[in-house]
Each structure stands twice: as C-alpha cells, then as structure tokens.
C-alpha cells in the first residue's frame, strides 16, 4: 500500500475507534460490553500498526528524494516537497517523522559543500559494499576443508564457510564450521553464531577454524547408495558427534547401526544421520583427473585399507601356537583392534608373523661377554663331537691289549647271545618306561596337581568331621549307650577314611616328585 491509502485507512480506523468508544459508554449488557472491549483493543492495535507502516513509508520516500536531488538545499522547509505532505493534526508518529527528517537534513548539509570528500566516501563505500558482497557470496558455501587434529594428523571434512578472514601471514583465508564433527573439538558451538558464547577461545566447542583458501577442496555429497548391510559408516549419536559404526540392518529407509565403541549402544537412524566413512577405498575413485588427484591426496593423508586380495606375509608355523600354553589374551586384543590372522602388522601387512625365539642370557654379563660365551659353546660342541668319534678307537685298543683265556672264549660263545638279548630287552623296556614317565609327567602334571589339591581338601573336611564327632561324644558322655556307640562307630570309620586319604595324598606326591625328578634329569 502507498502513503495515501495508509493515511486514509488510518483516518477510517480512528473514526471507527471513536464510534466504539461512544457505544461502550451507552451499552450496559455484559456480553455486548465484552465484545466491544475486544473490538476496541483490536482497533487500537490496528491503528498502531498502520501508523508504524505509514512512518516507515514516509522515511523511505524522504531518503529516495534526498538521493535523487543531491543539490536540493536541505535547510528549506521540508513541507515544500510535493511527495511529502504532513497532516495538519500531528500525532506522536508524525512528530517522530519530523524529527527524523530534520536529523537527515542536518547530517546531509556538509555533503553539498565538499564534493571531493563525498567522492572519496562514495569510493570507500563502494569498496566496502564489494567486500560485503564477496563475503555474502562465500558465506554459506559448502567446501571440503582440512582439519589438523591435536595428535598431528591431517583430515579433510565437509564444512561450511561462515566468513572470510585473513591468515596470520597475510594470505586470504576463510572461517569454516565442520558439518560432520567426529570429535568434540570440531562440534560447532551453539552460541557462537548468535554472539552469546561467554567462553571465547576457552570454549570446548568449535568457533570455526580459519584455513587458507588454497587448501580448500570441492564439496562432495555423501553417497548413501554405496551403503549396504555390514558396511562401515559414520553415524550421528545423541551428542551430535559422528562416530564410526557398522550397518547391521536396513529396512524402509531406516538404518540399524552398531557403533565400534563398546560404550555406545546400538541405535536405529534415518538417512540424514548416516554417511559413508571418510576413508574411502581406492576402487571408488573415478577415472577423471580431478578425482584421481583427490584420491591421491586422500591416500597421502590416510593409511590404505587393505583388501582381501592383498596377500600378507605367509607364516610357516601355526600363528598363535604358543598360546596353547597361555590364556590367549594377546590374540583377543588384536582381534578387537581389527587384526586379521595370518597377516603381519603395518600398512602393507609386511610385519613379522613368526614368533621370536626367547634366548636366556646369563645374569650380570654384558652383550659382548654373552656373544663370547655363545661362540665358545659352538666351538666346544664341535670339539666334543670330534673327540667322541675318537673314543671308540681308544677303547678298542685298550680292550685288545687285555689277555684272554679259554674260559673267556667259552663264556663268550655260550652266553653271548643270551646276555645280548637280555640287555637289549632291558634297554628297550628302560627307554620305554622312561618315555612313559616323561610323557606322563609332561601330560598329567596339571592333573596330578589338581588331584593333590582335591585330596588335601577332602582331608581337611574329614578332619573337621572327626572334630565334630569328638565334640558330640564329649557332650553325650554318661548318657544313653546307644548314641555313644553310634558316634564311636562313625568316628572309627572317619579315622579309617582319613588314613586312606592321607595315604592317597602321599602316593600322589611321590608320583609328582618322581615326574619332576625325571624331567630335571632328562632335560638340559
């Protein structure tokens, strides 16, 4: 609406308000009185709104007239302007309008006297307007900005530009807020954009990060089509941070995800709360040069994710075989951290998978002395091997020098076969018995220890039972003989069982000691 129509409407509303006031004075019915009061209030509000609209239009007309006629003397009577007619009855809005017009005329008077200053101010205003336009153009733009974490890694995240700033070295930069924060330090502060944050630089949330314009990359939309069941992703938690997770189920646009962290529960999310992981595989990159450069940049930032086709370091022995003698906590921790059995550690799975043999070195010796001892042992082993070959010759020569008679000849002929057979049989049985003892001590050492512990526990229980029976006999002394006889019978039986258990314990201990002694004598 224009100024004239608003002025006419304002007069009409005022006339209606006067009629309502007259009616309110004459009406006595409470129902009509309530309706008229509500109408009176509505008309007052409508008049206030119309006056404010009329005042704003008058201000705009005044400013446009000043811009269109800069040579107009501002000290003249403003009422002489044809487009600005002021009503005869001045209200509060009219007074405000008059004050505004006078202030504009006072501020604009120096401009007519000095043209050079006006041109300079116009030039500066134009530059400021251009800068504001550029800032408006960049503000709200979505880009891919770098993020330097506290532990020194460089990651590229999707972000939004909130303003242009200058870097410390004078280079052009922008302030960005990250759209998918993966850490608390990246999460935008909810009070920063409103200017109500009281912590400033000490805020634990992000007030935006200033990055160089040259480091920005084109924005990439999240491709939800690549997400499937059992594929990794980034999912938004209740705290607004995006955590790594894995999709377990997809049903009618809802994704059931299980977070990698054990502290976070499984949740069902919509498509806007889930994105593919930032560390995409190399196969997803297209053949265009720009995307290849982006892929190369991402590969330089992140470690490669090894696929199934990359062959790891082969292991000649069974991996983790040594854990048969332990609880296997090492492999469990490695599996929790994503390790795959049979592959080495490292970027290309080139790590060692063969276990390192433990070498026990003598105490109190330096490494040089240990190396000398090992070399002596090697040299001594060779020397012993040579001397052992020479020993039979010396024994043969010594045996040949002994004098022999007819009886030795006969004994050798008649008893030689029998004695040789007996000695061979005894040697075999001895070896067999020794092996059985060794194997038994090796395989059943734990079983023997368990059996000894069980027997000792039974002995303690039987001893407690005997103590209770003795106390019962002491209490029943001098009473009925039947109860005393039964207690004595039970006590004697318990003592026999205790003796048998003690004998069994001693035999088990002897077997255990025998196995330990045999092991000490056979293993060097």
UniProtKB/Swiss-Prot annotation:
One of its GO terms (cellular component) is nucleus. Residues 106-122 have a biased composition (Polar residues). It holds the Pfam family G-patch. Its main location: nucleus. GO terms for molecular function: DNA-binding transcription factor activity; DNA-binding transcription repressor activity, RNA polymerase II-specific; RNA polymerase II cis-regulatory region sequence-specific DNA binding; sequence-specific DNA binding; zinc ion binding. Residues 376-393 have a biased composition (Basic residues). Residues 125-137 have a biased composition (Acidic residues). It is found in: Nucleus. Keywords: DNA-binding, Metal-binding, Nucleus, Repressor, Transcription, Transcription regulation, Zinc, Zinc-finger. Residues 326-372 form the G-patch domain. GO terms for biological process: negative regulation of DNA-templated transcription; negative regulation of epidermal growth factor-activated receptor activity; negative regulation of transcription by RNA polymerase II. The keyword Zinc-finger applies. InterPro entries: G_patch_dom, Znf_CCCH, Znf_CCCH_sf. It comes from the Eukaryota. Transcription repressor that specifically binds the 5'-GGAG[GA]A[GA]A-3' consensus sequence. Represses transcription by recruiting the chromatin multiprotein complex NuRD to target promoters. Negatively regulates expression of EGFR, a gene involved in cell proliferation, survival and migration. PANTHER family: ZINC FINGER CCCH-TYPE WITH G PATCH DOMAIN-CONTAINING PROTEIN. This is Zinc finger CCCH-type with G patch domain-containing protein. The lineage of its organism: Eukaryota, Metazoa, Chordata, Craniata, Vertebrata.
């Amino acid at each position: 609406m224009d100024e004239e129509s608003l002025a006419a409407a304002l007069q009409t509303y005022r006339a209606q308000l006067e009629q309502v006031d007259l009616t309110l004075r004459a009406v006595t019915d409470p129902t009509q009185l309530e309706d008229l009061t509500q109408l009176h209030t509505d008309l007052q509000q409508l008049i206030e709104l119309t006056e404010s609209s009329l005042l704003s239009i008058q201000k705009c007309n005044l400013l446009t007239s000043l811009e269109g006629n800069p040579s107009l003397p501002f000290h003249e009577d403003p009422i002489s302007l044809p487009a600005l007619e002021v009503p005869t009855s001045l209200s509060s809005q009219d007074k405000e309008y008059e004050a505004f017009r006078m202030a504009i005329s006072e501020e604009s008077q120096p401009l007519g006297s000095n043209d050079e200053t006006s041109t300079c101010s116009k030039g500066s205003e134009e530059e400021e307007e251009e800068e504001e336009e550029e800032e408006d153009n960049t503000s709200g733009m979505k880009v891919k900005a770098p993020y330097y974490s506290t532990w020194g890694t460089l990651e590229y995240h999707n972000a939004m530009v909130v303003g242009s700033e200058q870097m410390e070295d004078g280079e052009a930069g922008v302030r960005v807020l990250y759209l998918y924060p993966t850490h608390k330090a990246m999460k935008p502060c909810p009070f920063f954009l409103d200017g109500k944050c009281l912590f400033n630089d000490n805020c634990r949330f992000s007030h935006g990060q200033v990055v160089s314009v040259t480091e920005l990359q084109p924005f990439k939309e999240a491709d939800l089509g690549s997400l499937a069941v059992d594929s990794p992703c980034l999912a938004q938690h209740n705290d607004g941070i995006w955590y790594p997770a894995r999709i377990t189920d997809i049903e009618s646009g809802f994704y059931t995800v299980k977070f990698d962290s054990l502290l976070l529960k499984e949740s069902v999310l919509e498509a806007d709360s889930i994105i593919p992981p930032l560390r995409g595989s190399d196969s997803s990159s297209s053949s265009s040069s720009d995307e290849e450069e982006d892929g190369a940049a991402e590969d330089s930032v992140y470690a490669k994710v090894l696929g199934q086709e990359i062959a790891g370091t082969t292991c000649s022995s069974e991996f983790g075989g040594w854990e048969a003698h332990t609880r296997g906590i090492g492999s469990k921790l490695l599996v929790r951290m994503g390790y795959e059995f049979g592959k080495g550690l490292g970027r290309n799975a080139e790590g060692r998978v063969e276990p390192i043999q433990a070498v026990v070195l003598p105490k109190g010796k330096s490494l040089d002395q240990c190396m000398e001892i090992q070399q002596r042992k090697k040299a001594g082993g060779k020397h012993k091997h040579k001397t052992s070959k020479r020993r039979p010759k010396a024994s043969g020569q010594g045996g040949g020098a002994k004098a022999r008679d007819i009886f030795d000849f006969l004994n050798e002929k008649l008893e030689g076969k029998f004695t040789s057979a007996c000695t061979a049989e005894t040697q075999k049985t001895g070896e067999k018995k020794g092996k059985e003892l060794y194997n038994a001590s090796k395989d059943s050492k734990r079983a023997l220890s368990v059996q000894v512990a069980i027997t000792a526990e039974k002995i303690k229980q039987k001893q407690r039972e005997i103590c209770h029976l003795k106390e019962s006999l002491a209490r029943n002394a001098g009473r009925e003989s039947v109860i005393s006889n039964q207690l004595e019978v039970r006590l004697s039986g318990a003592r026999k069982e205790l003796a048998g258990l003690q004998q069994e314990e001693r035999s088990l201990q002897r077997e255990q000691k025998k196995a330990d002694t045999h092991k000490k004598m056979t293993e060097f």
